[in-house]
Amino acid sequence: LKVTALSVFLYIGVSAQNIQNNPGSNHGNRFEQLGTILPTPNVYRTASGAPGQAYWQNRADYDITAYLDEEKRNLKGSETVTYHNNSPDYLDYIWLQLDENQQSTIKKTDYPFSSTLPKSTTNQQLKTSDLPAKDNGYGVNLEKVTDASGNPLKYTINKTMMRIDLPKILKKGEKFIFKIDWNYNIPNRIEKGGRGGYENFPEDGNDLYTMAQWFPRMCVYSDFQG
């Protein structure tokens, strides 16, 4: 059995400095007014786009131990996440990304749950809209989701998103520590596509692993998108 172990500590600033969405833009109309495109200045962002006097970013620290089983082509991880609420808001839940669920036939986002179809669709979209007959074995398997003391946390998974309900309100300036144990089978990147996976080299008898978005990670919480 060939197993590789690695430890990772990450700091990620969850930015509130994103550009506001502009659904009303004509995208290419040379006479379009700029009033709806430029973000409205506020205490968080000035008209120039520079941080304002009340600018904030939420923060997430990750302490990750990961094991790569090359024979089974499986990645197993245990991570401790420290989430800092620097926003002025009270938070009673948080969201995480489970990107690897897009590789699953039962957890991915490709097929609609609605009984209706859009007015315009393709043969490929019709094929992917069929519910799969069985699980193809891919996607994130959550082994444990607990707080820092080991108490189970209530969570809900919606395709590639996971919502964790906090045991108590997370106020401004406070932090919440939780742990997640997980694993997933690594897909063939050449066959299935995507940013991460393995590429097999039969002549060498080994695989090349190019892993991206490989661990459960915090979603951005911002002042204008929530």
Report the location of each language-model feature.
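Short, hydrophobic/aromatic-enriched beta-strand segments in well-ordered soluble domains
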Residues: E79-V81, N85, L98-E100, E174-N188
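N-terminal, polar/Ser/Thr-rich
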Residues: Q17-L75, G205, A212-F215
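Bacterial Sec-dependent N-terminal signal peptides
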Residues: L1-N21
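Short strand-edge motifs at loop-to-beta-strand transitions and within beta-strands
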Residues: T160-I164, F176
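Beta-strand-rich interaction surfaces with strong enrichment in secreted/lumenal proteins
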Residues: P51-Q53, I64-Y67, N151-L153, D165-I169
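Extended, low-hydrophobicity, Ser/Thr/Pro/Gly-biased non-transmembrane segments
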Residues: L34, P118-K144, A148, D181-G226
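Ligand-binding face of N-terminal immunoglobulin V-set domains in extracellular IgSF glycoproteins
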Residues: R73-Q102, K107, P118-N123
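Short, solvent-exposed loop/turn and secondary-structure capping segments
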Residues: Y93-I94, I106-T109, T156-I157, N188-G197
